Amino acid sequence: MATRFAILPVTALITLTAQAQQAPTPNDQAAAARANAEQNQQAQQRRDAQQRDATVQAPGVRSDVPRPEAYPVLPTETPCFQIDRFALDVPDSLPAASKAQGASALPMDRFAFARDWLAHYAGQCIGKQGVDLIVKGLSQAILARGYITTRVLVPEQDLSTGALKLALIPGVIRHVRFEDEKLLGTWKTAFPTRDGDVLNLRDIEQGLEQMKRVSSQDVSMRIAPGDMPGESDVVLDVKRGKPWTVVASIDNSGTRATGKLQGNVSLGIDNPLGLNDIFNVGFNQDLEFGDKRFGSHGWNAFYSIPWGYWTGTLSAYTSTYFQPLAAVNQTFVASGNMKTVDFRLNRVLTRSRNDVLGAQVRLTRRFGDSYIEGTTIPSSHQNATFLEFGLNDRHYFGSSQFDGSLAYRQGLGWLGSTDSMFAAEGGQTYRFKMVVLDANLSTPFVIGTQPFKYVTTFHGQYTGNTVSYLDSVTIGSRYTVRGFDGETLLAGSRGFYWRNELQVPVAQTGLSAYAGLDYGRVWGPEPVALVGTQLAGAVIGVKGSLMTRFGGYGYDLFAGTPVYKPSGFPTARVTVGFQLTAQF
């Protein structure tokens, strides 16, 4: 018998081996697709957290102008004259361009509010002191709206006619220019104003903010008088460092399945076209080089350019992973990839000393597949398009800063996109309709001589549809509800998480100790029953930065633990995390 087996042909041995290697079952395919979705969700969480941090840390320019008194009370004087009519006109001696800028005959004209302000005093008996108070009050009202070089004068006149005539001298921009005439680049993409426009402080603030977005560029401004009445030059003093930045970081934000240690490196180029634009490209890779059974990597890039009150940003990123997947009698190799292209257009709608309100439109294309043993899993295929409209706001309450956004997001059939194969049966869909809310409040305060800062962050979404895992709210990681190891997440089509953190700066060391308490909840029509819907966790840690002549270094070290979790939810009792960053 042994002799017979010894002479079996090679083809027979191959057949026996192939029979022993079973094909992946539908359950194996579902597990592989889920693993891919979890990896992509982790990468998406990291990007979302970075985007929220960038929003909160974005430069803001605020200028102090005196608050106007609503309507000064006029004194009783002798002599005084009853004034029934007010005239606010630009003197004929000024250029035609200045006269056009100062027009206020129509309700939507720039200075129409000034005429309405004057009308408050119609019918009152006004003397010399009253005229002075009116001119001062109107000047403050104009100044409060940002017209810091516009003036109001009183020409010679006879008040006994019952009319008070005032002269409006519009403050116009003669030139916007660099202090250093040899400086390369332009201010025109950053500033919403041009030569001959009325000088408004809010326009200047917008331009300065757009130039300060470039991290290696700092800008200050002064106003120099021109030759004609009301004319001024806006002179920009620009200080620039090296136009490139390399950032490298390492952390343990990954999972055991695809590499706990993660490394990132990026190159940022400031002003590549001299348009106050920004270009950045980065690469991430797991650092578990000793084990070739699993891994993850990806790259990302974005380009952003301003145009006055507009900002356009084009982003692209990929995520790829592979890992062993244990089946009943054998182990398969599961892998997947995701590619995303995103275009975002932002517009500042209004701005004041304490508030900047904007709108955004965003178009996203997403492609992805999951594989098991190199074979595509049809149910995991993604070719989706999303359109988003939203409002965003930054508001200052004293020393506190609030950043918030409210957006409507919808999946569409544009650009050749297809829906999920489960959508026809009422399952998960990429054609969902969703509302997304983000908010962050940072409040510094002092007890005795010790400064503190309280930071609270909220993220939530609501939809009436069943969405894919990648489009769900997930909780249980360092980017959402802290205190959990991130190996297992709770996910739902609807949900929110709320993070709270108290920071305590340590003297002048650049180090801050912090403690946090987070809570999250998810729910919705999910295809798989959840072990629970709520998580709460606590964290303590230290973070800070250090500047040297060789570069800047940052660190964040923390330990967290669950406060509440469902009984069937697996996680470590204590999770220790870190992130180290170097910038050159």
Curated annotation (Swiss-Prot):
Species the sequence originates in: Burkholderia pseudomallei (strain 1026b)
GO molecular function, one term: protein transmembrane transporter activity
UniProt feature, compositional bias: Low complexity: 24-44
Entry keyword NAD: no
Transmembrane segment boundaries: none
Superkingdom of source: Bacteria
Signal peptide annotation: 1-20
Keyword Ion transport: yes
Role summary: Potential outer membrane protein component of a toxin-immunity protein module, which functions as a cellular contact-dependent growth inhibition (CDI) system. CDI modules allow bacteria to communicate with and inhibit the growth of closely related neighboring bacteria in a contact-dependent fashion. This protein may be required for secretion and assembly of the CdiA toxin protein. Expression of this cdiAIB locus in B.thailandensis confers protection against other bacteria carrying the locus; growth inhibition requires cellular contact.
Span of domain POTRA: 98-171
Pfam families: POTRA_2, POTRA_3, ShlB
Compartment annotation: Cell outer membrane
KO phenotype (gene knockout): Deletion of this gene from the locus expressed in B.thailandensis abrogates growth inhibition.
Family: Belongs to the TPS (TC 1.B.20) family.
GO terms under biological process: monoatomic ion transport; protein secretion by the type V secretion system
Protein name, as recorded: Outer membrane transporter CdiB-2
One GO CC term, this protein: type V protein secretion system complex
Region of interest (Disordered), ranges: 24-72
The entry's keywords: Cell outer membrane, Ion transport, Membrane, Porin, Protein transport, Signal, Transmembrane, Transmembrane beta strand, Transport
PANTHER family in alphabetical order: OUTER MEMBRANE TRANSPORTER CDIB, SLR1661 PROTEIN
Chief place of localization: membrane
